[in-house]
């Protein structure tokens, strides 16, 4: 009985450790410049574990350099090994070469830019550049965005290899995050057909009130297929990224996506 239970226990421990890493990864680097990182209590609340269990797991992550702890504030952040693994991953699929393109688009538009792939029914952010603006909207690398309530998610659905109707059906119940969220499968399906036709998606407060965005597909290199692996997006506060401004940025976003296409990225 003991030997049979061990693998299950090991899997649970790994899942819990990954949950902690995700929480730390989703914490903006400038969330609290004077006290960066998260306290143990905050992490435990986010992963729905007791502080003692969280501490036991996080000590292992610290020992393996996936997490670091500030000796003064005792707050936790991602460690150097997490950075090494992230860079290895980006390099393995060619994403390091995307960074200059994202930076140019960020500088041109004044807003944060990001690249996402379809992963586990989410739009998984694999690269990003932060705006220099004090008030901005960031999608941190590693973050998973709702497909139906994000611009990049809607692009990935609209150009899905399985077709829009099937892709929407597989989403199941659509969570309504704000009054602007499209939570009806019928409405979402119709909207995604429009997105596929116009080749861009807008988001006006569909995930967070006051946060808008525009995204376009990154077409596959050397293929006639319109089924895509990547979506490129620009995000910002609604005070700057108005509907008119988003439409003005579509051409710049499309041009940047074409440059990324020419890189011939591997499948993430």
Where are these regions (language model features)?
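N-terminal helix-turn-helix
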Residues: 2-92, 258, 262-263
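Charge-rich, low-complexity intrinsically disordered segments
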Residues: 5-8, 244-268
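Short, structured helix-loop boundary elements
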Residues: 10-14, 75, 79, 95, ...
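Short amphipathic alpha-helical signal-transduction/dimerization elements
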Residues: 25, 153, 157, 161, ...
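A structural signal for short hydrophobic beta-strand segments in well-ordered beta-sheet cores
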Residues: 67-69, 115-116, 218
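Amphipathic alpha-helical effector-binding/dimerization core
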Residues: 72-73, 77-172
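Extended hydrophobic
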Residues: 180-257
């Amino acid at each position: 009985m003991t030997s049979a239970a061990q693998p299950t226990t090991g899997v649970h421990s790994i899942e819990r450790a990954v949950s902690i890493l995700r929480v730390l990864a989703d914490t903006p680097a400038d969330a609290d410049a004077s006290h960066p990182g998260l306290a143990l209590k905050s992490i435990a609340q986010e992963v729905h574990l007791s502080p003692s269990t969280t501490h036991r797991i996080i000590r292992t992550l610290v020992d393996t350099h996936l997490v670091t702890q500030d000796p003064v504030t005792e707050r936790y952040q991602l460690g150097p090994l997490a950075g090494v693994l992230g860079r290895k991953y980006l390099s393995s699929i060619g994403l390091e070469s995307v960074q200059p393109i994202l930076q140019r688009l960020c500088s041109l538009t004044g807003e944060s830019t990001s690249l996402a792939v379809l992963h586990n029914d989410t739009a998984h952010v694999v690269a990003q550049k932060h705006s220099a603006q004090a008030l901005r909207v960031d999608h941190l690398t590693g973050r998973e965005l709702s497909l139906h309530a994000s611009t990049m998610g809607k692009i990935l659905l609209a150009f899905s290899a399985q077709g829009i109707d099937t892709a929407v059906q597989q989403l199941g119940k659509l969570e309504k995050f704000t009054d602007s969220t499209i939570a009806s499968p019928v409405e979402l399906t119709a909207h995604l057909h429009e997105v596929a036709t116009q080749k861009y998606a807008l988001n006006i407060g569909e995930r967070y009130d006051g946060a808008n965005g525009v995204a376009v597909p990154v077409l596959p290199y050397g293929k006639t297929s319109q089924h895509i692996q990547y979506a490129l997006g620009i995000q910002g506060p609604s005070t700057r990224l108005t509907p008119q401004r988003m439409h003005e940025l579509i051409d710049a976003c499309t041009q940047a996506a074409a440059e990324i296409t020419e890189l011939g990225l591997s499948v993430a």
